[in-house]
Regions:
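A charged, aromatic-enriched C-terminal amphipathic alpha-helix characteristic of glycosyltransferases
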Residues: 285-291, 298-336
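Conserved donor-binding/catalytic core segment of Leloir-type glycosyltransferases
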Residues: 116, 152-172, 177-179, 189-190
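Short His-centered aromatic/hydrophobic patch
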Residues: 65-71
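N-terminal strand-loop element at the rim of the active site
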Residues: 1-42, 194-197
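Nucleotide-sugar-dependent
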Residues: 172, 223-230, 235-257, 263-272
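Donor nucleotide-sugar binding/catalytic pocket of nucleotide-sugar-dependent glycosyltransferases
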Residues: 95, 110-157
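Nucleotide-activated donor-binding/catalytic signature segment of Leloir-type glycosyltransferases, i.e.
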Residues: 190-193, 200-227
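Membrane-proximal helix-turn-helix segments that form the acceptor-binding/catalytic region
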Residues: 45-56, 72-73, 77, 81, ...
Length: 337
């Protein structure tokens, strides 16, 4: 097995934790996540060059394409040389509204052996027939081993602590949330994630506006989420742009695994799903009663019913997740024969 990965932070990676039979190929090229797409084009071109070189010289029997954009960047070569011999893992929507991009996504899916989607809302961009499309959830399996940590180590607070963890982006949307919740003594708003441009901008914005109940904690490791869960009352899972409207983010799963209510945005797939499943609420920070609505909803929450809802949603998610794993195992076992 050979893996090409993009080290966008140019930080040293601890590869010793992986199986020694895996050979890693590093593409080291610094690029900020929040950089404009026009500025990213040069980096994409360099990545394409390295990926093509590996595909042409590796003698591979099968390819797994993780995420949409890497697949698009080498789509011409995949369609010509690996049709029926690759898995297309579709995890982000971006430029599907552009005719060429949308058609190429369709072609990549149709020529794949299997296509996986991380959100059922992404199916609108894929063919409705011709290739199996399987829902593959972004669950970190180790999280399941820590599901009850919060029961034993929960730290209560008189304030409602709303926490975001992950890649901090969408400055304007988060400024609205800070405007609504900052300086409101009923709440604390916590951000965990790398302090790149948007995070620094939001931190400065909160300080400038005297929102001393808004905190930025910086970079963290995945396992730190178990600690965050023990001091969080609501997960901030609110996004708003065309690329995230249809996504199922990691925090959705953290919400149902750790049984923490989630705050989402109306008009998003996660907002629709969490309200339908009874695991969260969808509210728009443009609303003047945003803070009051959060307070009233949280204080009236039926905790017993909420936890049952989380358990039921997690059971449904794991059923699909394990079915996808079984399908992969069957495919690779057949390839090995």
């Amino acid at each position: 097995v050979e893996v090409l990965y993009w080290n966008r932070d140019r930080k040293e990676e601890n590869l010793n934790r992986y199986d020694s039979r895996i050979r890693f190929h590093e593409f080291s090229d610094y690029m900020q996540d929040s950089a404009p797409y026009a500025r990213k084009l040069f980096h994409f071109y360099r990545y394409r060059s390295q990926a093509l070189k590996l595909l042409k010289t590796g003698g591979f029997d099968f390819v797994i394409v993780l995420h949409t954009l890497p697949g698009i960047l080498v789509s011409d070569y995949l369609l010509k040389n690996f049709a029926g011999r690759y898995i297309f893992d579709y995890r982000d929507s971006s430029f599907e509204h552009i005719s060429f991009f949308g058609k190429r996504v369709m072609q990549l899916s149709l020529a794949s052996k299997l296509t996986f989607v991380s959100s059922d809302a992404f199916r609108r961009f894929l063919p409705s027939s011709g290739v199996p499309v399987i829902t593959s959830h972004n669950i970190l399996e180790d999280s399941l081993n820590h599901r009850d940590d919060r029961i034993h180590a929960f730290k209560a607070s008189p304030k409602i602590r709303i926490a975001f963890w992950g890649f901090i982006r969408h400055a304007d949307h988060n400024k609205k949330i800070i405007d609504r919740l900052g300086k409101d003594s009923r709440f604390e708003l916590h951000y965990y994630g790398r302090k790149q441009a948007v995070a620094k901008q939001l931190e400065t914005y909160a300080k400038t506006n005297g929102a001393d109940n808004v905190f930025f904690h910086g970079e963290y490791n995945p396992e730190d989420r178990y600690r965050f869960a023990c001091c969080t009352d609501i997960i901030h899972n609110s996004y708003w742009d065309n690329n995230t409207r249809f996504a199922m983010g990691n925090k959705y799963y953290d919400s149902v695994i750790f049984r923490i209510p989630q705050l989402t945005m109306p008009g998003t797939y996660m907002g629709e799903r969490c309200t339908a499943k009874g695991t969260g609420i969808a509210l728009n920070p443009d609303s003047s009663d945003y803070a009051d609505s959060i307070w009233e909803w949280f204080k009236s929450l039926d905790r017993i019913q909420f936890e049952k809802n989380c358990d039921a949603d997690l059971d449904a998610i794991l059923l699909e997740y394990n079915a996808g794993k079984d399908m992969l195992n069957n495919l690779f076992n057949a390839q090995a024969k």
